[in-house]
């Protein structure tokens, strides 16, 4: 079992280390561009207030954080979590002018943040890549405020 988890972790990391520069283009091709509409709708469902706090896990290139920030007047506190070094650097580069967004290199299974902090926990196209879904979900529950919303987008 442990080898399987390690193998998946290595495989996922290797894939994202290779595709990080073209990740958004790949999503455009695989979804025929519809992923952009889905992400807009995802943010619509959140309907974030200016003081909302978001933790975006498996942030990748930062598109969910960017949309969330824009929708709420670039005011909310947003924490982006990304485990892959190349995607982490790409996301930070893409959102370098957003002062309300901070980046942490970490895994969904072990979030280095306090309990009961966030109004929203988002993960888009990432839950399939975590090595321990149950542990990741426990972490989501831990970091959300009571009444906070878990939002997952997959295709």
Each PLM stretch: what is its role?
Residues 119-132:
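A short SAM/SAH-binding and catalytic strip from SAM-dependent methyltransferases
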Residues 109-121:
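A short acidic, Gly/Pro-enriched loop at the edge of an enzyme's catalytic core
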Residues 53-110:
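Class I SAM-dependent methyltransferase SAM/SAH-binding core
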Residues 1-24:
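N-terminal, positively charged/glycine-rich alpha-helical extensions of SAM-dependent methyltransferases
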Residues 134-146:
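A short glycine-rich, Lys/Arg-flanked "PGG" loop and its adjoining helix->strand segment in the class I
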Residues 147-154:
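Conserved beta-strand signature within the Rossmann-like core of class I S-adenosyl-L-methionine
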Residues 32-50, 67:
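Conserved alpha-helix/loop element of class I SAM-dependent methyltransferases that forms part
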Residues 46-48, 72, 95, 144:
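A generic alpha-to-beta junction signature in SAM-dependent methyltransferases
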């Amino acid at each position: 079992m442990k080898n399987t988890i390690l193998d998946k972790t290595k495989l996922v990391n290797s894939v994202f280390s290779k595709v990080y520069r073209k990740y958004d283009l790949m999503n455009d091709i695989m979804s025929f561009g519809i992923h952009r509409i889905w992400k807009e709708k995802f943010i619509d469902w959140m309907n974030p207030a200016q003081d909302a706090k978001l933790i975006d896990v498996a942030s990748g290139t930062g598109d969910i954080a960017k949309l969330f920030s824009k929708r709420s007047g670039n005011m909310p506190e947003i924490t982006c979590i990304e485990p892959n070094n190349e995607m982490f650097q790409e996301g930070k580069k893409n959102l370098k002018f957003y002062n309300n967004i901070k980046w942490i290199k970490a895994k969904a299974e072990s979030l280095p943040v306090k309990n009961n902090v966030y109004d929203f926990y988002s993960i888009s196209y990432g839950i399939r890549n975590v090595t321990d879904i149950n542990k990741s979900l426990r972490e989501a529950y831990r970091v959300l405020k009571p009444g906070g919303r878990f939002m997952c987008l997959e295709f």
